[in-house]
UniProtKB/Swiss-Prot annotation:
GO terms for molecular function: ATP binding; DNA binding; zinc ion binding. This is Transcriptional repressor NrdR. Transmembrane segments: none annotated. Residues 1-22 are annotated as: Disordered. A zinc finger (unnamed) spans 3-34. Residues 1-11 have a biased composition (Polar residues). The keyword Metal-binding applies. Residues 49-139 form the ATP-cone domain.
């Protein structure tokens, strides 16, 4: 591995441990030439995953889009950036564990809603209001009532 400091190819691994929910290996290395220490990550190369959008077009899976959407839904809520990242990790893991090459944006949206329902009620409703494209107040209220019933807060 090339040292980022002196650009020599002689380095040794001084520590190695699982990372990213066992999907990567974090290695701490030391350059044998200059003694500089640096970290590398080894990950499994995954097949590209395509998202089928509502209009039928396909685009590469982009976790940043999901992160942006949940952060917008959770704006000014007591949700940390680590919690947002963890939510997106869970969604991506659900998708990738299926071993498929394509998935609909609707299915991804449902996974996001499932995760948000457990994290924050307000963020869930905000996300649902965009994702589900409510046509009227009664369909919006039905979603709220369903969520409250699942959480044991309603009726």
């Amino acid at each position: 591995m090339e040292c980022p400091n002196c650009h020599q190819n002689a380095s040794r691994v001084i520590d190695s441990r699982p990372s990213d929910e066992n999907r990567a290996i974090r290695r701490r290395r030391e350059c044998e030439n200059c003694g500089f220490r640096f970290t590398t990550f080894e990950r499994i190369e995954t097949a590209p995953l395509l998202v089928i959008k509502n209009d039928g077009t396909r685009e590469p899976f982009n976790r940043k889009k999901i992160l942006h959407g949940v952060m917008a839904a959770g704006q000014k809520r007591p949700i940390s950036s680590d919690q947002f990242e963890q939510l997106v990790d869970h969604v991506e893991n659900k998708v990738r564990k299926q071993g498929i090459s394509e998935i609909s944006s609707k299915k991804i949206g449902q996974y996001v809603m499932d995760e948000l329902a457990d994290l924050d009620d307000v963020a869930y409703i905000r996300f649902a209001s965009i994702y589900r494209e409510f046509k009227d107040m009664s369909s919006f209220m039905k979603t709220m009532e369903d969520m409250m019933a699942k959480k044991g807060k309603g009726n």
